[in-house]
Amino acid sequence: MATEAKRPKTGDEKSVLEPLNNFLLWCESVQLTLSDKVYLSKEGTAAEYGMLAKEDIEEGHVLFTIPREALLHQGTTKVKKVLEEGKKCLESASGWVPLLLSLMYEYTSSTSHWKPYLSLWPDFRTLDQPMFWSEEECDKLLKGTGIPESVITDLRKLQDEYNSVVLPFMKSHPDLWDPEKHNLELYKSLVAFVMAYSFQEPVEDDDEDEEDDEKKPNLPMMVPMADMLNHISKHNANLEYTPECLKMVSIRRIGKGEEVFNTYGQMANWQLLHMYGFAEPFPNNINETADIKMASVYKAAAQVARSEANQQLLEDKWKMLCEMEVVGEKGVFIFGQSGSLTYHELYTTLKVLCMSSQIFEDFRENEGWEEDDEDDDDKMEQDLSFEGLASLSVEWKRLLCVAATETLDSYNEDVETDRRLMEDQRALAELSSRERRALYVRLGQKNILQRIQQLTKPAS
């Protein structure tokens, strides 16, 4: 089954084909070369725009090449000099402000070099991340997934960034930006545009000895043509970076008529929906994950710490775990399709919480170190895999089972309700695109959580 559309199909054929043809002409003018073996279309693809194979394509074939001069970012925009001069006052937590100012200028300029490219998104209506959903819809469809909380944080941050950094800078350059035209609503749309369509070049690891000098990630940039490809976890193409250009290369054989898919990385459905506005149909996403809040494991331990002495011991244990930076107030333990992905943190947490008072005192005196510590990474990973959970001690399993159950209870619907809906093809077809994507997210998470619950529940 193909992935659900990254960009829902809307509008008539003419309104889509004319901008697409203009874009292809622009590609020729900037020496963006497209292989004769592929073509762009909105028919037969997983999205309004997509790339299809005209004929069989072998592994290693270059599907298209784009020169770096055709990329859109703060170093190529017409206002790059102004942005460079104001570099200091444009610093922000996201690091996106220079790119967003570039996009605001180029998107609203009738003479922009990138106009044929940016015209593919005439009003950003195709962007459908949850940040554009109502609060009620988010809570109804996505409660428990972690997305509503992320959206609230995103909206607060972008509004603060616009008011404190972007607006003052625009007001100091009225010849280039107009706050009436380049308003918060446009800024929000462009933030979503960057989230969904930008690319970040991987940081080169030139000097492995410089461990202390951690390199900053490269800033995002817009890559025309690359963002026409849709994503699935089992992709068949990959973007490669060279000093002169970027190339999309097939990583396996692609059959005639097959869609060319890129990848955004190993992303769970909640991440895909949050950042890109789509989700892979359940159970197709091999990178699916589910989170259990660290606080839920603490609550599970608190249920059996009935005496005042035991409650104090639990608080001391948790405090030490915090000091060791193993847990945090808003932290989560992450589970994937095969078990815990944060096995070091989870193993240490379960071990400390289940220690007797004497063993914990010894542990604390040694500042978290044990002389004969046999808990290497391989053992931790195996013990907290789905193959190993059933063999854990009763105390460890109880904490995991209670925490997983609490997490499952945080959703609006139980797992069986969602599973029945997924299996009812008629009911599934009647769902809106938002309802369907939300279902894929919920069911992917619940499936993992239910497995944890089943593997750790007490023997009857």
From Swiss-Prot:
Keywords: Methyltransferase, Nucleus, S-adenosyl-L-methionine, Transferase. It holds the Pfam family Rubis-subs-bind. It is an enzyme of class 2 (transferase). GO terms for biological process: negative regulation of NF-kappaB transcription factor activity; peptidyl-lysine monomethylation; regulation of inflammatory response. Its EC number is 2.1.1.-. Residues 28-265 form the SET domain. Protein-lysine N-methyltransferase. This is N-lysine methyltransferase setd6. It comes from Danio rerio. The lineage of its organism: Eukaryota, Metazoa, Chordata, Craniata, Vertebrata. The gene is setd6.
